């Protein structure tokens, strides 16, 4: 079974279109009005070893909040749909990723209980058109809509760019590992995820 999804989410504020194939490493095309966010999405999807297209239009361009949140929601829904009943997936993963002085831990469980616990000390208030307060919000919206329990903790570092990028790399690597097929079982004592 192909593990991919095409999701379109349109509101009065944004229009988001996501195509995601979690089993085929290929081209990644990202188009949002937030340059640094584009960089982080490319990073996330590259480390997931995926093929993806993300197109985001901001109908009310007040600030970056709606784009960040709505892309997170739509990408989360795409991962959830692509995983189907989650049969055979490894389910759990953790990664500790350095980027120069920054060190970030990501631990996740594809549990169908979406929640995020994010502990990052982001010293800059904005980077590349992105308000850094929206980084934890991205992870929370993504986790809730993908059904992933997600923990992200900064272990060291002071450069905001490095801390954020290490977080997206670690999340991508953890998602790649947790979504790998390891057998034909549902990895849960309940028999469902």
Curated annotation (Swiss-Prot):
Coiled coil: none annotated. It comes from the Archaea. GO terms for molecular function: imidazoleglycerol-phosphate dehydratase activity. Keywords: Amino-acid biosynthesis, Cytoplasm, Histidine biosynthesis, Lyase. The keyword Ion transport does not apply. It is found in: Cytoplasm. It is an enzyme of class 4 (lyase). It catalyses: D-erythro-1-(imidazol-4-yl)glycerol 3-phosphate = 3-(imidazol-4-yl)-2-oxopropyl phosphate + H2O. One of its GO terms (cellular component) is cytoplasm. One of its GO terms (biological process) is L-histidine biosynthetic process. Pathway: Amino-acid biosynthesis; L-histidine biosynthesis; L-histidine from 5-phospho-alpha-D-ribose 1-diphosphate: step 6/9. Its EC number is 4.2.1.19. InterPro entries: IGPD_sf (IPR038494), ImidazoleglycerolP_deHydtase (IPR000807), ImidazoleglycerP_deHydtase_CS (IPR020565), Ribosomal_Su5_D2-typ_SF (IPR020568). The keyword Transit peptide does not apply. HAMAP family: HisB. Belongs to the imidazoleglycerol-phosphate dehydratase family. PANTHER family: IMIDAZOLEGLYCEROL-PHOSPHATE DEHYDRATASE, IMIDAZOLEGLYCEROL-PHOSPHATE DEHYDRATASE HIS7. This is Imidazoleglycerol-phosphate dehydratase. It comes from Saccharolobus islandicus (strain Y.G.57.14 / Yellowstone #1) (Sulfolobus islandicus). The gene is hisB.
């Amino acid at each position: 079974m192909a593990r991919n999804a095409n999701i379109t989410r349109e509101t009065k504020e944004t229009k988001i279109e996501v195509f995601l194939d979690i089993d085929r490493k290929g081209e990644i095309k990202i188009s949002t009005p937030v340059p640094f966010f584009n960089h982080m999405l490319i990073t996330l999807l590259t480390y997931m070893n995926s093929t993806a297209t993300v197109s985001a239009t901001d109908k009310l361009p007040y600030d970056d909040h709606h784009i960040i949140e709505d892309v997170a929601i739509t990408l989360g829904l795409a991962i959830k749909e692509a995983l189907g009943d989650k049969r055979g997936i490894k389910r759990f993963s953790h990664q500790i990723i350095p980027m120069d002085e920054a060190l970030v831990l990501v631990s996740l469980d594809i549990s169908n209980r979406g929640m995020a616990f994010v502990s990052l000390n982001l010293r800059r208030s904005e980077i590349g058109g992105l308000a850094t307060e929206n980084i934890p919000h991205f992870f929370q919206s993504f986790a809730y809509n993908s059904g992933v329990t997600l923990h992200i903790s900064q272990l060291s570092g002071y450069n905001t760019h490095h801390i954020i990028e290490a977080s997206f790399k670690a999340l991508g690597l953890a998602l790649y590992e947790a979504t790998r097929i390891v057998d034909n079982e549902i990895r849960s004592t309940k028999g469902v995820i």
